[in-house]
Amino acid sequence: MSGRPNSRGSSRLFRAPSEDASSGSSGSAVLPQEENPNASGLTRSWKAVMGMVFILTLLLLGFINHMKLKEKAFPQKSRQIYAVIAEYGSRLYNYQARLRMPKEQLELLKKESQTLENNFREILFLIEQIDVLKALLRDMQDGLHNYSWNADIDPAEGWNHTEVIDEEMSNLVNYILKKLREDQVQMADYALKSAGASVVEAGTSESYKNNKAKLYWHGIGFLNYEMPPDIILQPDVHPGKCWAFPGSQGHALIKLARKIIPTAVTMEHISEKVSPSGNISSAPKEFSVYGVLKQCEGEEIFLGQFVYNKTGTTVQTFALQHEVPEFLLCVKLKILSNWGHPNYTCLYRFRVHGTPKDDS
């Protein structure tokens, strides 16, 4: 009997822990567990980190969008800046062009005034020479007058003789002034523009291009101060009033005022004394003249080759070396060389003389 109770007791003892375990397990399922304070702190820190990351992401996206908008707007601003710079440059260039134009006109006025001043000096020199001659004649008159008094000659006759000499001196002065005003060549010029002559551009060299002689507006040259080829057919010979062509060789085809048999030509250039540069290296040196048949389009007939002497007189006339049997309306001038200018040759005036055709 004592063994059975022990087995029951042992069984009780054996089940007791299972009941306790079961009761413990059931208790653990029902009763709440205690929270860990370290775990809750980590959760809050992660939330703060995620919030900061989110805010930084938003700021980064906003910055990127701002840069994209700025990059899109920059080309427009750059174009506006370039447009302002271009407009400023154009205004500055136009302002400089307006400044250049009065300078060029002032230079021309200076050249003309210098020429007039030189002519005035020559006239004053001639007047001084005339005054010297007058003084010498007065001395002679005084000597004659004294001689007349010593020879017991009537004084009235001496005074009359003095008046005659004064009149002769006045006539001499007028004659000298008349010669100064007259043409030195004393031959008709059938290449004179005012008489009806002209330059045929189709048979004439191109003019020398000089950008400094242009007036600009907004960067576009619209007014040219270069002299045309027909300036060589006009009597206005002043520094700068010449036709320039590039290089040392060129030609000009001239239609005369009427048909003539050419006998001579005249070349005129300014002197070194009135040249603003102090030299006339652009003056023509060797040149030849041809007659052209059939209304300026036919055969060329050689009339002569000549040399313009830059140290001689400014107006030089040359007799033609070959005669033509018929009347000509056109003459061609060919410049073969100049006096050393490397860029251009300048012609001031060219004349053609001869025997005109009798229209009657």
Swiss-Prot record:
Keyword field contains Coiled coil: yes
Polar residues composition bias: residue spans: 1-10
Entry's transmembrane regions: 48-67
Keyword field contains rRNA-binding: no
Membrane topology of this protein: Single-pass membrane protein
Quaternary structure and interacting proteins, as annotated: Self-associates. Interacts with SYNE1 and SPAG4/SUN4. Proposed to form a spermatogenesis-specific LINC complex with SYNE1 during sperm head formation possibly implicating a SUN domain-based heterotrimer with SPAG4/SUN4 associating with SYNE1.
Domain comment (free text): The short coiled coil domain is proposed to be not involved in load-bearing and force transmission from the cytoskeleton but in mere nucleus anchorage instead.
Protein name in UniProt: SUN domain-containing protein 3
Species this chain originates from: Bos taurus (Bovine)
Gene coding for it: SUN3
